[in-house]
């Protein structure tokens, strides 16, 4: 297989970490092979979608046999570049930010929060979950264009001004947990995660589209 990564749909790309996590669990349990139906039941993605997702990468399985767990795990580790650590900076060491620092993506081998920023003098100079907390005034000095990803858990009113500073420091991706909708250059990728909206959506679907028991 060529070392060049195939171009795949963004929806497929978002599901790859889900597949990878389940395969890691299968491998840990000693399972040698898995069918698309078993994968479907575990990750709640229909079998046809799984087979289509996998088809973008060529022949990963055999009809009637399923997929070799070790092979798939190795393949997705390379595809997701699990052996290369991406360093992340977190902004806003409140309740949510603190939770992120204590968790620090312990189930992921390829992402790690290495520094955090806040304006609260009582937090500056401390460490949370082993991660040093710096004053926001030190942003440019500390980032120096070396950190590609930022997580924002700051107040919404501060999000855009902070984003503008991050762009000048070479940030390529932002995971935005604020309600603010950020304006960024076209080469910057932003994923918005509004927990309040997600909760409202869940309640709406529970009320209006109940699942059969």
From Swiss-Prot:
One of its GO terms (cellular component) is cytoplasm. SUPFAM superfamilies: NAD(P)-binding Rossmann-fold domains, Winged helix' DNA-binding domain. The keyword Repressor applies. SMART domains: CoA_binding. One of its GO terms (biological process) is response to redox state. Keywords: Cytoplasm, DNA-binding, NAD, Repressor, Transcription, Transcription regulation. The keyword Acetylation does not apply. It comes from the Bacteria. Pfam families: CoA_binding, Put_DNA-bind_N. GO terms for molecular function: DNA binding; DNA-binding transcription factor activity. Homodimer. Modulates transcription in response to changes in cellular NADH/NAD(+) redox state. This is Redox-sensing transcriptional repressor Rex. The lineage of its organism: Bacteria, Bacillati, Bacillota, Bacilli, Bacillales. The gene is rex.
